[in-house]
Curated annotation (Swiss-Prot):
This is MEMO1 family protein YN1551_0739. The lineage of its organism: Archaea, Thermoproteota, Thermoprotei, Sulfolobales, Sulfolobaceae. Transmembrane segments: none annotated. Pfam families: Memo. Belongs to the MEMO1 family.
Amino acid sequence: MKRLPAVAGSFYESDPKKLKMQIEWSFRHNIGPRDIPKQTYEKKKRDNLFFVVPHAGYIYSGPVAAHSYYYLVSEGRPDVVIILGPNHTGLGSYVSAWPKGEWETPLGSVKIDEEILMQLVKESEVIDLDEKSHLYEHSIEVQLPFLQYFFDDDFKIVPIVIMMQTPEIAEFLADAIYNVMQKNPDKDIVVLASSDMNHYDPHEITVKKDVEAIEKIQQLDYKGLYEVVEGKDVTLCGYGPIMVNLILAKKFGKKAYILKHATSGDTSGPKDSVVGYLAARFGS
């Protein structure tokens, strides 16, 4: 079963050569890390297990996303990347995993880790196997070219989209991921929470709203983050995935480190209506 790219040519370049140049542009951008990370091939225990990455078009959020990937790549190639994204389309079930096969992008194909996936399904009791949720969803797809640029096809993924973004669902998923990671100590597993921040307010308002959410992220306060999103009109689209990583970070004794916060007004667009972007890592 192959999942074909839905947003190649719109969110990112469809030509492989141009796409690689776009990824390099993201790293070298003045909002980005300004350098391309050197990949280590030395196998050692990973410190940064969990990340927040944005998922807009690369010209807008690529430089911010590059900060998270800089840290991920610097610690070497993971065996498995669990990618949690919000469900923008409204299709499919409340929590949906792509069941098997591979995902294709202009840079090639990446296989699903079916063994880890089925362990998660068994542990969580809330994950459905459902392709429909993923067919047109961009929040996971846009992460793959960044990973493929450095690791080619030498890693596997578990793609999960979350429509019901509640603290209770986040707890179920975090418990399942934690248990699976504990049962597979020899597998190098990383979890990406794919999310943009506040949407379509002027730059100054977006920054103010985002800061309220970022404070909760720094405190690993997943219920507080939920309250900010629900109670203060912060239109953060992937708060469910972020809540999962906040719970996981606390379980593993990690701290939150904000790598970069910017808006589309900082990267490529006007500042009268912007989207906020955050790169964060959770490590020692």
